């Protein structure tokens, strides 16, 4: 009822309801980014409180990313089966349980359950599939820009809440650092429940930029798993799927996996405190916000393969630079700006290519598999970097390896540009 009333008001103002959905997703991603950032803020307080090794916590974060990778392909078809709102509410419930159990943990295996399973399942179900689904369903025009805006909320969450969580760990019990994630999740759940809609047709609207109302199939045969695997069966025959999946694996390896989880401990190894290190992540988050929206704008106007090749190459350079920096204010500020502009700039062109190749319904589902590869890369880096640190007493080899992996991704896109493969942009059948 409230959504219909708001839609009537917006119609009078000449504003499409799609922008309301984009705003809600932005706020939800803002809140979930706080939850996703909690392990990297809590890794040092937990190890100091219980005398554990960094690898004891990083194995939990590695499991979290692994679970995310395994469940990403299920998120979009689950939204198709039970609705976006229901999926969001399930995710919020799991995040609340995961955060509470993390701060109450006193055995190592507790973290495997709270961080690894609860937060991992929540992240897997929602992933970036929510942004891809809403952008694909609600926007025909400006889709790349909208994806950039919605995914940039992850950076905005870091900018706003990570320094707050770090500050809480120093002035009060570190357990209270989860408060921003809990409060934000509850607020966003209420917004989705009151204002969220699955399809524009539920409000008798076409997608933004379209002139015809799209009515989805009233019933989709099969469960979420069968829908997901059926979409995958068609996608794996397309060369674009393998290129996007491999490079997105490298994206996860070199962003959320190593930097997202190990930048603060790396700084601690070089005598940079947790608050100062989180401030650099916040600065990185600000420029990530700018970079991701800029990437969305660029992806609507320029060759997406060229953009992705450039993004990965620049990221590789920044990862190779970090170990050689002096870890002083100037060096880390420069790095945070440079890396922040590129942190998740790969998402808008990747989402757009998925929609172009695989269609309005199958596109978000296939992107779920591609994002699963991303999170698998994150899992490898999250655990592998921590293990490498414990064995070698330094993070330097891990960052070098991540930097060179980015160059592999760049070479893949250069290959595509050089040999001009005849990839059709006609979406395959939307049949489920």
Predicted regions and their residues:
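C-terminal transmembrane helical hairpin of 12-TM major facilitator-type secondary transporters
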Residues: 276, 282-288, 294-353
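Conserved MFS/SLC helix-loop-helix module at the cytosolic interface between two early adjacent transmembrane helices
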Residues: 70-109, 299
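Extracytoplasmic gate region of multi-pass secondary transporters
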Residues: 39-46, 233-295, 381
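Extracytoplasmic
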Residues: 17-54, 71-75, 162, 257-264
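Cytoplasmic helix-loop-helix junction between adjacent transmembrane helices
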Residues: 115-152
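Helix-loop-helix hairpin linking two adjacent transmembrane segments in secondary transporters
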Residues: 150-203
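Interfacial helix-cap and linker-helix signal at transmembrane-aqueous boundaries
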Residues: 46-47, 78-79, 160-172, 267-268, ...
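Hydrophobic core of transmembrane alpha-helices in multi-pass small-molecule transporters
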Residues: 98, 110-126, 249, 331-345
